Amino acid sequence: MQTALLKPKIIAVEPLGDHHAKVVMEPFERGYGHTLGNALRRVLLSSMVGYAPTEVTIAGVVHEYSTIDGVQEDVVNLLLNLKGVVFKLHNRDEVTVSLRKEGEGVVTAADIELPHDVEIINPGHVIANLSAGGKLDLQLKVEQGRGYVPGNVRKFGDESSKVIGRIVLDASFAPVRRVSYAVESARVEQRTDLDKLVMNIETNGVISPEEAIRQSARILVDQLSVFAALEGTESAAEAAAARAPQIDPILLRPVDDLELTVRSANCLKAENIYYIGDLIQRTENELLKTPNLGRKSLNEIKEVLASRGLTLGMKLENWPPAGLEK
């Protein structure tokens, strides 16, 4: 009797248009089509990295409810058009670009001035329409991100957004616009109870549908890997203990092991100094304040510690260790 699960594969990628494709995967064991299809869909829509305009400064505009002389669109519609520009950044996480246009005509994304490592996927996208004498001058900040971040969230967290005239935008970073999936019947030899997963994916052009599938699968694998290693996972206490600095065993030994004179040893115990680790954290001045412990006893203690590579006034983390008896 076969107990191993069938391993699916991508058997077809059918282009349906620009940045739009149908991806077919089979065979899946019964039920796995919906299990993986739903998981991939959620990751594709929520967890993919993309780029979006996040802030804009427009010459002569103080807030988004303004109008601009010579520009047919009001500022609200202008901002909506700017958010429709699809950017792709290479080897950087953010950039500020400029747009300066005057005179009658249509302003498109192609009019934006770009550095060499920034690309616009939809250069024909219309941003504004200028009439005779119209002028548009703006600075646009583009950032890398994930998911959807409302502008009011960024306003509270970013001091720079309080600058007068700087408008913070709602940012939709997701490069995947639409995802749907269907599960159909599949057959392998005599088995007819299998699933075929058909995914319909449309992106904004920053990544291809095939690459979107690959990235979403890697995200799922990374998130699930912790469960695969569950048996060997350390407890929180064990992990904390492993991270804690290791204490030199000599510091756990009693001060009696230093073979000090009876006078010096008794003075230390009177001050609750029972272990070498307790002793090395004391300074010379602190020890000299100990009753009946004079300069001669102090020099003796310093010499004995020095012979073991230790000194007074040392700092120890996590001292005393748990379970150390006094």
UniProtKB/Swiss-Prot annotation:
Gene3D superfamilies: 5' to 3' exonuclease, C-terminal subdomain, DNA-directed RNA polymerase, insert domain, RNA polymerase, RBP11-like subunit
Keyword annotations of the record: DNA-directed RNA polymerase, Nucleotidyltransferase, Transcription, Transferase
Region of interest (Alpha N-terminal domain (alpha-NTD)), ranges: 1-231
GO molecular function, one term: protein dimerization activity
Stretches the record annotates as Alpha C-terminal domain (alpha-CTD): 247-326
Annotated family: Belongs to the RNA polymerase alpha chain family.
Designated name of the protein: DNA-directed RNA polymerase subunit alpha
Native source species: Ralstonia pickettii (strain 12J)
